[in-house]
Amino acid sequence: MAILVSGGAGYIGSHTCIELLNAGYDVVVADNYYNASPVVLDRVKQITGKDFRFYQADMTKHEDVEKIFAECPDITAVIQFAAYKAVGESVSKPIEYYYNNLNCTLVILDVMRKHNCHNFVFSSTATVYGDPASVPITEDFPVGATTNPYGTTKAMTERILTDVCKADPTLNVALLRYFNPIGAHKSGLIGEDPNGIPNNLMPYIAKVAVGKLEKVHVFGNDYPTPDGTGVRDYIHVVDLARGHVCAIKKLETNCGLFICNLGTGKGYSVLDVIHAFEKACGKPIPYVIEARRPGDIAECYADPTKARNELGWVAEYGIEEMCADSWNWQKKNPDGYHSAN
């Protein structure tokens, strides 16, 4: 039995491949390298000592996905990471985001149906909750009040998967709503390597620490939070990857539709993260306070009870280890995967 990991060369996908391989699964990776490096998969093999099948494929194209399933009849489940994911870019390129992010899932579902594959894990996000009325956030909070096209593509895909699941009682779907993944594999061989200037806090801090950027821009210090900066639920990417292995095992019980938050249940402010990173790297991180960004919310963290009770999953790593592992990756790879060239 093999797991198809769509977008498996990406940040979360590559860490998930490691956890699947270490758990004894056969893995088939598909990626078009739009926002990933071929170096990643070599390093996954180096870390695990295991080989896997790879297809350079565009998951919006039927012929690419059909080829994978035709040549790998042992695929019994799909984990779907493939997506455009930059919030700011989604605002300026909504057509590209809706086309790519919705079609990736629709094409995979269509081909799965033809090949009698019945298990699907979807990489969703806590942004589907919009600005929550309260925290912590449970899975029954309302969704859909998203603030950007990226988040809306995730909410729309969740709705599509819910409808398809209702229509097909043989289909099992896990909607995993991630909070804020950070950190890197303990080896320092793989980590987060965004193209251009990072959109997310942790890779930005890491680039400042390694001297590639001058200072961190903190957007807003007038939120109703303990220090005025935005609070988020940061989760170690290795913990998040383990959650996908637990989700695959859940689908093997023929659970139908399963929705679950993957977060720690603890919120940390932007300044908390900066100070934790300063401890990890042993140097000050310069930052400047700027105006709030449109669409940002004050506070967002998970209630992880369902994941604990129904997946048997608990986040193991705290903010100190997340920062230490991010720094280990960045100092070993100051130019990301380009350092290997």
Locate predicted features.
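N-terminal Rossmann-like NAD(P)+-binding domain of SDR-like oxidoreductases, especially those catalyzing
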Residues: 1-184
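Hydrophobic, Gly/Ser/Ala-rich alpha-helical and linker tracts in large acyl-processing enzymes
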Residues: 185-198, 205-208, 214
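C-terminal substrate-binding subdomain of Rossmann-fold SDR/epimerase-dehydratase oxidoreductases
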Residues: 201-341
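Short, basic/glycine-rich phosphate-binding loops at helix/coil junctions
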Residues: 183-185, 222-223
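Oxidoreductase cofactor-interface core, primarily capturing Rossmann-like NAD(P)-dependent enzymes
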Residues: 176, 187, 216-218
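Short, flexible active-site loop motifs that bind/organize anionic cofactors or intermediates
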Residues: 7, 31, 55, 80, ...
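Short-chain dehydrogenase/reductase
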Residues: 98, 147-155, 191-199, 203, ...
